[in-house]
């Protein structure tokens, strides 16, 4: 018996080179349009980013826009503020303010309580000293304090500040002495910078 004759088959293509898309053309076109629309929707979405604060809950960031037609989300207590501020700090400053916004001076008890908060232990002494100086020279301006304006109290100007804790007044001689020190320090700094610049230039010339 003779050997069976083998028939030659054409070589099969390599599977790794087959990159034919099995999706119909119409379905592929519809899928591309849907993906483009979804991408545009994600880009146009005005979702505010989330900010991690000291609070355990995530809060959205409020966007501040300068355009008058844009509406900015705000709380009910922020409607009287001219610009974004911290409400707690704003109320704290209002509580410590010795004079009201209408220019009316506060009562001595309230002023004493404010001074006791600002400088504990010196409130009574500063009040007694201010009263004695007012009786002694009512029109003479006191160093370190605002002069009183004739014609009524001025908002924020008729309140006398407590004396510094150190009790040392700054004189014109002190100012001139400090100015001389600053001038000498600047001259030394300029000389040091000039010497460093010359040294670097010499090093570059010798190295080149």
UniProtKB/Swiss-Prot annotation:
Stated family: Belongs to the MBD3L family.
User: Source species, please?
Assistant: Homo sapiens (Human)
Listed name of the protein = Methyl-CpG-binding domain protein 3-like 2
**Compartment(s) of residence:** Nucleus
List other remarks: The MBD3L proteins are encoded by strongly repeated regions of the 19p13 chromosome. The exact number of functional copies is unclear, and some of them may represent pseudogenes.
Fetch the Pfam families from UniProt. MBD_C, MBDa
InterPro entries noted in UniProt: MBD2/MBD3_p55-bd, MeCpG-bd_2/3_C_dom
Query: Which GO terms of the cellular component aspect does the record hold?
Result: nucleus
This protein's encoding gene: MBD3L2
């Amino acid at each position: 018996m003779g050997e069976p004759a083998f028939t030659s088959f054409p070589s099969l293509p390599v599977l790794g080179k087959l990159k034919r898309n099995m999706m119909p053309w119409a379905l592929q076109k519809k899928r591309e349009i849907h993906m483009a629309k979804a991408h545009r929707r994600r880009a146009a979405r005005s979702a505010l980013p989330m900010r991690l604060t000291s609070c355990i809950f995530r809060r959205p960031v409020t966007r501040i826009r300068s355009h008058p037609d844009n509406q900015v989300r705000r709380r009910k207590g922020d409607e009287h503020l001219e610009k974004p501020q911290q409400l707690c700090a704003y109320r704290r400053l209002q509580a410590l303010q010795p004079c009201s916004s209408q220019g009316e001076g506060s009562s001595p008890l309230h002023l004493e309580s404010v001074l006791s908060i600002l400088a504990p232990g010196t409130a009574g002494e500063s009040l007694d000293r201010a009263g004695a100086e007012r009786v002694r020279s009512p029109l003479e301006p006191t160093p370190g304090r605002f002069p009183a304006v004739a014609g009524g109290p001025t908002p924020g100007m008729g309140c006398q500040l407590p004396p510094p804790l150190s009790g040392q007044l700054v004189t014109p001689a002190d100012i001139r002495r400090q100015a001389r020190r600053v001038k000498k320090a600047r001259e030394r700094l300029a000389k040091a910078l000039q010497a460093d610049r010359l040294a670097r230039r010499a090093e570059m010339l010798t190295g080149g």
